């Protein structure tokens, strides 16, 4: 996912399915966890990836994110569980995937529990830092690119440069917006 730790913007979740046919081509690129890549490279690679993989993403802008957060009991993990499971089910319907790898955000394995209706032949792995698996890295790149595009739209809407993250530039952006 992308946007979870940012002060501004919404939330984007993505799932990617790789096949034997596209795995090697993608593995030969510089794609890795989006946190280890610069944003310009992410924005260049995401469209290329989208042409080559099965993927589904859910892009919640701030208002919709806030509505969904409330609808999920003001619990971001419950919302993330539904978003991840929804994306994974859409991608799983596109092919015969033997394994599903999920970047774990809760020790209770909520996405695994939500996906129990998938094929008994599907191995579900939910672990922290799952971006070491290529499909999860690809999903992180696509989600980050979508989030960056979302921030660009929001910046244009309010006519200020909205900072990424949650650090020091956020306070200055809030002051500029109030002014």
What are the residue ranges of the model-derived segments?
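RNase H-like, Mg2+-dependent phosphodiesterase core
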Residues: 1-179
């Amino acid at each position: 996912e992308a946007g979870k730790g940012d002060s501004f913007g919404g939330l984007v979740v993505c799932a990617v399915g790789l096949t034997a046919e596209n795995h090697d081509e993608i593995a030969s690129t510089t794609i890795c966890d989006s946190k280890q890549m610069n944003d310009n490279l992410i924005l260049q690679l995401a469209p290329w990836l989208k042409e080559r993989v099965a993927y589904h993403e859910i892009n919640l802008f701030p208002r919709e994110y806030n509505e969904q957060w409330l609808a999920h009991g003001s619990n971001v993990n419950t919302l993330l569980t539904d978003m991840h499971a929804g994306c994974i089910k859409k991608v799983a319907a596109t092919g015969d995937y033997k394994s599903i790898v999920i970047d774990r955000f809760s020790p209770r394995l909520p996405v695994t529990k939500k996906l129990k209706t998938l094929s008994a032949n599907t191995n579900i792995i939910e672990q922290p830092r799952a971006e070491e698996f290529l499909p999860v890295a690809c999903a992180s790149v696509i989600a980050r690119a979508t989030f960056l595009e979302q921030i660009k739209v929001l910046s244009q809407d309010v006519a200020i440069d909205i900072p990424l993250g949650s650090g020091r530039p956020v306070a200055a952006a809030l002051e500029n917006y109030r002014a």
